[in-house]
Amino acid sequence: MRPIKKSRSLKLPKSILEEIGESDSSARRGKRNHNLPHREKRKFARISRGKNGYENRKITEEGDSKSSELNDDYLDAHRKSSTKKKSSQNKQAKESKLLDPIAFQHKIALEEDDREIAHLEKMLGIKSKDKSAHSKIDKEFGWLLEDLDQEIDDIGVPGTEDPSYGHSEDSEVSDDTGDHGSVDELESEREGNSGEEEEEFHGFESNSDEFHQPETKPIRMDPLKPAVPSLPNANVGSKYVPPSLRKKLGGDKESEDALRLRRKLQGSLNKLSIANISSIIKEIEVLYMENSRHSVTSTITNLLLQTVMGRESMLDQLAIVYAALATALYRIVGNDFGAHLLQTLVERFLQLYKSKEKEPLSSHKETSNLIVFFVELYNFQLVSCVLVYDLIRLFLRSLTELNVEMLLKIVLNCGGQLRSDDPTSLQDIVTEMNLLLASADPSTISVRTKFMVESITNLKENKKTKVANASAQSKFEAVNQLKKFLGSLGNRSLNAREPLRVTLEDIEQIETKGRWWLVGASWNNVPSGDNTLSTEALQDKKKSEELTAHSKILQAAKKLRLNSTLRTSIFVALVGSEDYIDAWERVLKLHLKRNQLPEIAYVILHCVGNEKLYNPFYGLVALKCCTLQHNLKKSFQFSLWDFFNELQPDDDSEEREISMRRIVNLAKLYASLVIEAAQPLTILKHVDFMAINAQMQTFLLVFFTDIILGVKDDLQLVKIFENCKAEKNLSSKVDWFLKTYVRKNPLVDNSKKALFKSNLAMASAILQSISKEEI
């Protein structure tokens, strides 16, 4: 890039100079020479003395010194090729310089213009010295070059028309004939000026930005925003749509992945049965690993509800298997699955119930099927009794045919579970029902309504109806088998163990209060002002009371010699609970390992043995343990056999004296477990009936007396003693003990002697028949 001057003096056109004349030109020469810079004066003086022999120097395309540029423009365009005429050409050039010094200054100005034009041509992308390039000049900057050409024409510098100013390459050899000292001096001066001229050039580049359109600067990416280019058709002010709603906005067309997932789940549900439920759960777990959790959860929920709602009559066996599958997935996957299923189920049920409330009962097949499926979910402990009681209160608003049918479905399928979970709420339900019946016309009460009222009343009084139906028996066996399967899931790590405690209000107000199954997602209206202060005071008081009670419980644990941290934690969970259900839930929250489960049985038996009188609370907790955890059931058996070793030690060991209250309380505890089928009668297989001592005799006497008096009906008594078939010769041993010790039991009240004798005779007959079969 050629260096240029930052500014130059004003130049007059040739026509004006001719009009002024020779006299004016001489004065103008003096004035012009006077205003020249110091360096230009020195150059002009050297040229005037004829000491410069360095006019014609070879000009290269990449040269940037000022001397080469001056000599290039100063020489004439027509140079001669012969080397013999070099001296004459140099003389003519010197004479032309001496004749008109003003033309030399104009030549310098012309050189500056050429450099400026070359720079602009380069910036505009135009090849230099190309006349056709004027047609390619941008329309915006064409006026700039046109003015520069006009200015050159006005100056009219001699030498551009004079052929005597040679411009051939051969004439460059004559530069060496001059004075070498003057050449070196000129070279140093030109090199000294190169720095200033480069600075002037950079300044020109900064000013030349005004002649160009501003280029787009690279945009710096924001690290806090995703590096995704904006779409050309995207709306800048459009509202953000979450991924969960994009499918609804995009239409009902499902993707291939969703269809493939739906087919796989549908195939798994079609193969579902009690025998292969474990393998089906493993297949669904694999689908959870391969797909998004929400997709699998929503697809399973829709398929289950569609299958349940699509049947004319819901078979109990099918509802039980589907409910067991849903409960198992709830425990394995977590609260998200169970909450989504329960929320969707109740919403669809309420929608159907409210839309068809006044229609005949025959049009409520879907509603009836959904309530049966919901009841089975409650039986398998996916949902707590709170929501069930809320639905019962909803149905008790009016005794319509639909409400009576819904109440019967609930009472007949899960009445016993409701009574054991919350008997107080059941009493409130009976009270509301009686008030509703009192206000109704007796003539309008149907037979179905009377049967429903009778069933709820019997449930409150714990009167079980005798049902000898084969389907009911098969259903009972299927439920027990699936409950054992769900209990076996405790061997693996589970994400949910407790039933979902949700109310009907939470489900109905999910849009306003938020998702009830997420911690912190629901919103409650907190009162302000004095009410807030009083609430905080009550909370502080409650916390202080809890701390005091907790310290007392720890002291009681020390007195009972529960010194280990694990046993103390189990004791605090049991004693600090509100009821046996709360106690079981607190024990589950400890998340004990498999090898730590026997400690639960140890603490319960230890607490029972130290009570002054038998506390049925521990029996109910033990019943929960044996029913829901097979490992705990075995732990209670092993603990009983250890207790037998204490009661009747071996011949080598000394007999220990055990307190009577411990013997009686433990006998009553295990008798209650045998009555509820939580433990079989074969737990006595290690007892040597022919060599029992007084302590063992007392235990067995209390044990069999409670069983004979505690059974509800003959069928239950038959089931208990038929378990002796599993152990050979156990029936004959038990029969001998009943005839020898139990028949003459003085502890039986006179009011119960008749019942005691009849049940004892039936038990003896059962045992004798088993003994004959073994022979």
Curated annotation (Swiss-Prot):
Protein keywords: Nucleus
Record-annotated MIF4G domain positions: 262-463
Location(s), subcellular: Nucleus, Nucleolus
Chain ranges of the MI domain: 565-689
Positions of region (Disordered): 1-101, 152-253
Alphabetical list of InterPro entries matching this protein: ARM-type_fold (IPR016024), CWC22_splicing_factor (IPR050781), Initiation_fac_eIF4g_MI (IPR003891), MIF4G-like_typ-3 (IPR003890)
Composition skew (Basic residues), residue ranges: 1-11, 28-49
Protein's UniProt name: Suppressor of glycerol defect protein 1
Organism per entry: Schizosaccharomyces pombe (strain 972 / ATCC 24843)
